[in-house]
């Protein structure tokens, strides 16, 4: 992936950059792997806002991505690398020998025409999925299962990868991008390599309208609201929040307060917390 930097010929292109999409080999998605995606605008089934700052955005169709990699010991050919509006990573279209087609996350350096497979005996090549117990120490992996057979749940964002650092008993120890070190069951599957499109983090939107295209609405500071709208609101002119520490719109501690639930079932898996 390359980054296209725009000249400042309008205010909207000043400091603007975007992907050059040089790695995209096919523009039209596979129709059999599309699903309807309804815009929720942050509302739940009762119409109550449960996620703020969501709404609008370009109409999208969901691409059904295979996170489980449960088609074992059957080789597939990479037919194309495609854009997915629902995530920052690219997706790869696979054509299996038995005729089935599936999408997977496109790892770095995966090219059209490459052969990929999943299973305990799959070779240690980029894009192949194996149990963590069969992957050597020091290998970079992504799309990692937390429970065997549930499908990949972590390390799916563009440019991310985890490293296998130890194996002991029924667990494999991973170092995550957040510097957290945690254990995962050795039967869990993971995909070899790093997720592609690593330059995504260096993009600059350049104008508010591009945020709106993504379905993200403005975030208003609580200190500029009225007292009835936020605990930080009110006062004459530019006044402070009037509290010892910042809080959320509902009065809960914010900015630095740990939000992980105490005594969570997976606490025993975490060796070192993220920084």
From Swiss-Prot:
Molecular-function annotations in GO: rRNA binding; structural constituent of ribosome; transferase activity
A single BP term in Gene Ontology: mitochondrial translation
Biased composition (Polar residues): 10-22
Record keywords, A-Z: Chloroplast, Plastid, Ribonucleoprotein, Ribosomal protein
SMART domains, per database record: Ribosomal_L2, Ribosomal_L2_C
Pfam families named in the record: Ribosomal_L2, Ribosomal_L2_C
GO cellular component terms, A-Z: chloroplast; mitochondrial large ribosomal subunit
Localization in the cell: Plastid, Chloroplast
This protein's record includes keyword Metal-binding: no
Primary localization: plastid
Region Disordered, residue ranges: 1-28, 227-251
Family membership: Belongs to the universal ribosomal protein uL2 family.
Protein name, per record: Large ribosomal subunit protein uL2c
Natural source organism: Rhodomonas salina
Protein's gene: rpl2
């Amino acid at each position: 992936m390359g980054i296209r930097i725009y000249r400042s010929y309008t205010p909207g292109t000043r400091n603007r950059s975007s992907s050059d999409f040089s790695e995209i080999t096919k523009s039209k998605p596979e129709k059999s792997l599309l699903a309807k995606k309804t815009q929720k605008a942050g509302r739940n089934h009762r119409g109550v806002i449960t996620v703020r700052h969501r709404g609008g955005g370009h109409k999208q169709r969901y691409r059904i991505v295979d996170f489980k990699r449960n088609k074992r010991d059957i080789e597939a050919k990479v037919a194309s690398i495609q854009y997915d509006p629902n995530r920052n990573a690219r997706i790869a279209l696979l054509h299996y020998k038995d005729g089935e087609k599936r999408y997977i996350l496109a790892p770095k350096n995966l090219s059209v025409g490459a052969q990929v497979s999943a299973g305990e005996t799959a070779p240690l090549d980029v894009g192949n999925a194996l149990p963590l117990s069969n992957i050597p120490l020091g290998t970079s992996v992504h799309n990692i299962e937390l429970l065997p057979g549930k499908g990949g749940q972590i390390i799916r964002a563009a440019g991310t990868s985890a490293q296998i650092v130890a194996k002991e008993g029924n667990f494999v120890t991973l170092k995550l991008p957040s510097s957290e070190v945690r254990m995962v069951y050795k039967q869990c599957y993971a995909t070899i390599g790093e997720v592609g499109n690593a330059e995504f983090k260096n993009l600059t939107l350049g104008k508010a309208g591009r945020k709106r295209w993504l379905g993200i609405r403005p975030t208003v500071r609580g200190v500029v609201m009225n007292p009835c709208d936020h605990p930080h609101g009110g006062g004459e002119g530019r006044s402070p929040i009037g509290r010892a520490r910042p809080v959320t719109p509902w009065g809960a501690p914010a900015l630095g307060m740990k939000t992980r639930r105490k005594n969570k079932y997976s606490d025993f898996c975490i060796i070192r917390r993220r920084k």
